[in-house]
Amino acid sequence: MLTDIALDAWGSDKAPEPEIKGAILACRHLPVRVHLVGQQDVLEPLLAQALRGARLPIEIVHASERIAMDEKAAQAVRTKRDSSMRVGLKLVREKKVAGFFTAGNTGAAMATAKMVLGALPGVDRPALALAVPTLTGPTILLDVGANTDCKAHNLEQFAVMGEMYARKVLKVDRPRVGILSVGEEEGKGNDLTREAFPLIKALPLNFIGNVEGRDIYNGHCDVIVCDGFVGNVALKTSEGILKLVREMLKISLKSTVTAQVGALLSRRAFDEFKRRLDPSEYGGTPLLGVRGVCIIGHGSSNDRAIMNGIRVAAEFATAGVNQQLEADFAAPADSHA
C-alpha cells in the first residue's frame, strides 16, 4: 500500500529540479505516491523528460504561486493564496495526502501550516524538532527556531512531543528526556529552565534532568528541549563546526604525499563519516504540534535530501504521531506515556 505525500515543487533554492528528481527517487525506493505541487505547465514537460518513459506514481497538483526564500513570511502567507505550500497543506487538511514536505522558506512554511492545519488541541505552540546525528543514533533537539520566546509550559509540551517522536518514529524504548541548560544540577540555568524543570519532572517520562551542550552530540540523551532561540543558535553553530571540520580534513589530507596515500587507504571510512553527518540523509525537520504531518527541509536540499524528506513524512504518517499526540494532550496529564 502506497502512502500519499504532497511535495512542494517550488521549495528548494534550485527548484524544481531537485524536487522532480527526489520524487522519482522516492517512488523508486519507497512505498509512496508523490503529489508534486506547483505550476502544471512548467512541471509537466520537466517531469516527462526526467521520467524518460518510466511509469511511476507521481501526479502534478497545480498551484499558480511560489513563495520565495527572501519573502517576508507573514506577507507571503497572507497574499499568496494559491502558493504551492498552501495548496500542498490543504491536501493534508482535506486528508487527500498523509503528509507534506517542503524545502522552502521555513518561516512561511511554519506560518502556512499553523494557518491551514491549525495547532493540535491543547498545544500552545508547535515546535521544530531536529534529529541530530550522534554515535549511538539521532538525538531530538526542539525547538530549533519556531518559538524564540517561550514559557515553562511550552518546554513541558515540547518534552511530550519530542518523546513521542523518538518513541514512535525512531523506535527508541523509553527515550531519555533532558532540558538544555548551563549545568546538570536542578537549580542551574535561567528562569525558563528552572521553572520548566519541575513541570517536566512531574510527567511520566524518562526525565534525566538538565543536560549541557556537549550532550547534544554524545548520545547520552534522546530528547533535549529548549526555546527556539537557544535551539537555533545550537543548530547554526553545529552547521558551522561541521563545515569547518570538513574543510580542515580536506586541507590536511592534501597537505603531503603521505597524507594523500593515507586518505586513499581510508576512503571507505571517510565516506562513512561523510554519510553519517550528511544533512541530506536526515531529510527534514518535522513541525510538531500541528494537525497534520508537515516536514520542512533545508533550502540547499538535493534530490537525495528531497527523497529522505518524503521518507520522513511517510514515516510520521505511518507511525500515527499526530493522532497519538492529540489523544495525549486531550487526556489527563498522568496518561502521557
Curated annotation (Swiss-Prot):
One of its GO terms (cellular component) is cytoplasm. Keywords: Cytoplasm, Lipid biosynthesis, Lipid metabolism, Phospholipid biosynthesis, Phospholipid metabolism, Transferase. It catalyses: a fatty acyl-[ACP] + phosphate = an acyl phosphate + holo-[ACP]. GO terms for molecular function: phosphate:acyl-[acyl carrier protein] acyltransferase activity. Transmembrane segments: none annotated. Pathway: Lipid metabolism; phospholipid metabolism. Its EC number is 2.3.1.274. Its main location: cytoplasm. It is found in: Cytoplasm. It comes from the Bacteria. GO terms for biological process: fatty acid biosynthetic process; phospholipid biosynthetic process. It is an enzyme of class 2 (transferase). Homodimer. Probably interacts with PlsY. HAMAP family: PlsX. Belongs to the PlsX family. PANTHER family: FATTY ACID/PHOSPHOLIPID SYNTHESIS PROTEIN PLSX, PHOSPHATE ACYLTRANSFERASE. Catalyzes the reversible formation of acyl-phosphate (acyl-PO(4)) from acyl-[acyl-carrier-protein] (acyl-ACP). This enzyme utilizes acyl-ACP as fatty acyl donor, but not acyl-CoA. This is Phosphate acyltransferase. It comes from Acidobacterium capsulatum (strain ATCC 51196 / DSM 11244 / BCRC 80197 / JCM 7670 / NBRC 15755 / NCIMB 13165 / 161).
